[in-house]
Amino acid sequence: MADKFAIITGASTGIGFELATLAAKQGYDILVVANEPLINAAANDFEQFGNTVTAVEADLSTIEGVDALLAAANGRQIDLLCANAGHGLGHAFLDQEVRDWRMVVDTNITGTAYLLQKVLKPMVARNAGKVLVTGSIAGYIPGSFQAVYNGSKAFIDSFVAALQNELKDADGVTITNLMPGPTDTEFFARGDMLDTDVGSDPKKDDPAKVAQDGWDALMAGKASVVSGWKNKLQSTLANVTPNAVLAEQHRNMAEPGTAKD
């Protein structure tokens, strides 16, 4: 058993898989979770680094799912949390089923907030711990045809900044917001966005590079990091661009049928 223990959510593929790989390489015992059986295959990959790996299949859109994840830690001190689990959804809001957009809200907002509250309390009590939350540059942009998803990431970006202020006197506890742009993961397929300009773009960011940027910022105790120079530029411009313009720009890349041949 290693001295260090980390939890990584959404770890079956993509950015979460890469974050779990980095944690295992750095000598952490890890508890990994995803809402699919693939998490067990991912755990086999992480075991090659010689540390203890525990995999949990749980739905983090529910309080019960988060509780099941934390119960799997068996009371062990959590030194590091990568709150990466998220859910995306494309198409026009009025065409979406309530159960589908509720899954976005419950996973990205409710489940994340509850998990952070449960993990941060003991971290603050002992003045030690690191938390990485996967936000998004989408939080800066009114997301036409991804309205609920972008709204959920706007919550995360604001929520993390507020927590950082509330906990500024908690020496030894840091919270870092990782804000990627479009990344080459299963996100767009799962969100039914492969027929969109952004979903079909072959030049998405490498999840391993995004994870490394987040990990480096986490270890350095930084408040936030935008991964990739194009995303840094886009997030900067979003602060000075009217919302109506941003929404139209987002429509052009996220509306169904905009995929380029």
Residue ranges of predicted features:
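Conserved glycine-rich cofactor-binding loop
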Residues: 12-13
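Conserved NAD(P)H cofactor-binding loop of Rossmann-fold oxidoreductase domains
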Residues: 84-89
